[in-house]
Amino acid sequence: MNLNLHFDKGTILIYGVEEGQLSQLDGVVWDERTLCYRTPAADYRQLVTTLREQKISFQDHARKFSAETFPLKKKITPRSFQQEAAEVWMSEQRGVVSLPTGAGKTILAVMLIEKTGRPTLIHVPTIDLMRQWKEVLSEYFDTPIGLLGGGINDIQAITVATYDSALIHVTHQGNQFGLLIFDECHHLPGEQYQFTALGSIAPFRLGLTATPERADGKEALLYELCGPLCYEIHIDELSGRTLAPYVVETIEVEMLPDDREQYEIARERYINFLRKARVSFNHPNGWSIFLRRTSESPEGREAFKAYLLQKKLSQASGAKIDRLWELIQLHQGDRMLVFTQDNEMAYRIGRIFLLPVLTHHTKLPEREAFLKAFRTGEYPILVTSKVLNEGVDVPDANVGVIVSGSGSIREHVQRLGRILRARPGKQAMLYELVSENTGELFTNQRRRKHRAYEGTAVLPNQSGQNYSEIN
């Protein structure tokens, strides 16, 4: 009796199994409801490979795709590292490729779509990126490019989907694509997004990211879902070649007296509570323990307010506004991106200097208008909280100022990447404004633990200094 494979809501149903045939496969379980064996759809490749190796005949009703050709309508001349990455990935047709922002991840994907020749679903985190991918794919392929997300449900042989929309549709579309591409694939191990990979039978998988590492250590799950990290190249290896040469400078800013006084009072209250409650952030669950302890008493709740206040004062010190103005004056004629940790500070800077501000609240038409004006030079400065951290193409930016940020290494590398797209004669500058003698210094040290920042300068508080002359 032949085995029969069927796709069912993100899983594979296996009928006609004889005793012991699938004993070596993890994840294959007996389902009393359907009276057959069942396994996650992501195990399709391993299942089919095992059946063929054991010369077990089977009928494949699960797969609803076949080989296709996607001829390129314009020639690609890959850079040497893109060619290397393509060759390494093609050897197994699974794996994660880590390239810096601006190094041509999308072009690499175009190359691999053409070489693989299977219906392809590309996952992206935002609607902006979905449209950006469609624009590039349409430039290289004659075939229609489908979209899934933002109210659009147009499935084609090459389709770009947001992670959210792909998740919604994977239970009934998980057998229609042979190649999955996960852009910004560090999102994939998220509690929900992982099911977009688990629920698909696609045997070929490509993860693309500038920073595969995750704060929660779930890289192992990423590699399980996509394949191993098969190729990696770093920002410093491409600086001055594929990417613009760059300098990163940390400027310690002395807080205004009133801000400093409030900061010290709030921080003392917060630190005293940590000691009294015996909370240590060196503990793996230190933050969770802190939140629990602060919720247990009025004193704890006051300590939490003090924590938020001292953090806000260090990140949004008025002295940083003064220093930002100096940098704006210094870099007249350049294209500058100003990054903040939160929307409040972004809008505050926008009001003070009459600058356009991009946040997640900015409507799409206004966002597109701001980005277009930035590219043409009508708006030489854009202020943003987090929406430009990831993916949005701003090739004309050559100066970045981080007024405030998290301790995330990924966020920091992404912000640097926003200003590194090469053009003739370009020299990129990234400034970090850090309040002197505050907890923000530790945050800065934590997020700089990446080779892209080795050897970069930390400048003392020197108002009026010509920073561009310091190396």
Write out the residue ranges for each language-model feature.
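Conserved helicase/translocase motor-coupling segment
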Residues: 279, 284-363, 367
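Walker A/P-loop
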Residues: 92-116
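Conserved SF2 helicase motif VI
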Residues: 99, 211-212, 408-429
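Post-DEXD/H (motif II) to motif III coupling segment of the RecA-like Helicase ATP-binding lobe
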Residues: 186-247, 258-261, 265
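Accessory DNA-engaging acidic/polar modules
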Residues: 1-84
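Conserved helicase ATPase core of P-loop NTP-dependent helicases/translocases
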Residues: 131, 135, 144-155, 335-339, ...
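A short beta-strand element within the Helicase C-terminal
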Residues: 175-178, 220, 383, 390-406, ...
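Conserved segment of the helicase C-terminal RecA-like domain
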Residues: 418-446
